[in-house]
């Protein structure tokens, strides 16, 4: 090979290397309006959770709160009303809601949102039974609806909310949880909301006396918001109102456990119920990952965050520390002794200590 030929080839190679380096150094261009790498699964997700409206030509109205839209020959239930937005804007909005950088493009973190376990309540739009305007809390993370429960206890200024657990629905459970353990999970979760607000909760023995009905459901169960089996949608709830208002539905097909200590024990029903009660009280999803109202399931989270406390207190009023109701320690001790693994007891002892301190303050 001649020197000139070698020199020419070397120049070509060096030029190619420089061009590759230059291309890699260039910033990734932002998507133009309406442009996105959003595939069918992405579009279905954006529709289902309120980030995108395909337009009336692709949808059939079911009622004033819901319509069915066709996505690649599959019908998807979509909340109404929705803003008409393009795909890139919808993806950016989703990323903002999940606490990610709003690039409008589908990266690995964004793609995981489509399959990660989460609440079935839409992130955008007025949800089903809810009526009235929405407002954000001071730090603009948790959305609070003006729809709320208004029944007041006769001997205090607390708002009394009655709840009922459908024991018969537990026959479909894919779990070892029983009625005693679940009842105590519910008592414990309602207590956490009541100690931060002027709310009082009472379990009742008849469904007709309850504002909040808690039950397990499978697949299509008559409310238009179907469950999808294990994974993805874990539960949904309806905001305060008549008929289904305030009701909490849990997917019976999920591998429910009480505490999910390592992210592999199953889905923590304590975490999910605490989240869904927030919806039943009038709160919507938060973009703050530390909030119990964050839409995606987060192991190890069993308490309200600062945003949650501010939101529920803003809706129902803050409860003075001296009037916080204490948990019944006998019921709770029995519950934990029988239904919690030994390696989870430290978490529960922390909660017990907090509740006993509240009890001492009341006395």
Curated annotation (Swiss-Prot):
Principal subcellular localization: secreted
EC number: 3.4.24.-
Annotated propeptide span(s): 26-126
Manner of cofactor binding, per the entry note: Binds 1 zinc ion per subunit.
Required cofactor(s): Zn(2+)
One GO BP: collagen catabolic process
A GO term, aspect molecular function: zinc ion binding
Motif Cysteine switch: chain residues: 117-124
Localization annotation: Secreted
UniProt-annotated binding residues for Zn(2+): 119, 275, 279, 285
PROSITE patterns reported for this sequence: CYSTEINE_SWITCH, ZINC_PROTEASE
The family this protein is said to belong to: Belongs to the peptidase M10A family.
Protein name: Probable matrix metalloproteinase 095L
Organism name: Invertebrate iridescent virus 3 (IIV-3)
């Amino acid at each position: 090979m001649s020197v000139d030929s070698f020199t020419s080839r070397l120049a070509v190679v060096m030029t190619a290397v420089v061009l590759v380096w230059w291309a890699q150094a260039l910033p990734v261009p932002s998507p133009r309006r309406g442009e996105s790498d959003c595939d069918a699964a992405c579009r279905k997700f954006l529709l289902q959770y309120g980030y995108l409206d395909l337009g009336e030509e692709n949808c059939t109205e079911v009622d004033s709160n819901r319509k069915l839209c066709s996505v690649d020959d599959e019908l998807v239930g979509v909340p109404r009303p929705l803003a008409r937005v393009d795909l890139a804007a919808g993806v950016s909005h989703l990323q903002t809601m999940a606490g990610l950088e709003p690039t409008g493009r589908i990266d690995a973190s964004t793609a995981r949102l489509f399959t990660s376990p989460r609440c079935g309540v839409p992130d955008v739009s007025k949800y089903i039974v809810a009526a009235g305007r929405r407002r954000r809390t001071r730090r603009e993370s948790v959305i609070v609806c003006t729809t709320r429960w208004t029944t007041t206890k006769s001997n205090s200024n607390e708002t009394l909310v009655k709840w009922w657990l459908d024991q018969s629905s537990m026959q479909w459970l894919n779990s070892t949880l029983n009625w005693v353990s679940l009842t105590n999970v519910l008592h414990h979760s309602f207590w956490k909301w009541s100690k931060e607000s002027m709310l009082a909760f009472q379990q009742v023995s008849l469904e007709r006396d309850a504002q909040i009905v808690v039950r397990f459901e499978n697949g299509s169960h008559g409310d238009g918001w179907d469950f999808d089996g294990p994974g993805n949608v874990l539960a949904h709830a309806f905001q305060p109102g008549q008929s289904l208002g305030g009701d909490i539905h849990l997917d019976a097909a999920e591998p429910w456990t009480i505490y999910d200590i390592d992210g592999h024990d199953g889905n923590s029903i304590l975490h999910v119920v605490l989240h869904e009660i927030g919806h039943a009280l009038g709160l919507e999803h938060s973009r703050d990952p530390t909030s119990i109202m964050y839409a995606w399931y987060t192991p190890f989270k069993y308490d309200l965050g600062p945003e949650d406390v501010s939101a529920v207190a803003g809706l129902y009023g803050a409860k003075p520390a001296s009037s916080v109701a204490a948990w019944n320690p006998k019921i709770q001790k029995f519950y934990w002794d029988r239904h919690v693994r030994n390696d989870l007891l430290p978490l529960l002892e922390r909660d017990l200590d907090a509740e006993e301190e509240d009890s001492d303050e009341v006395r």
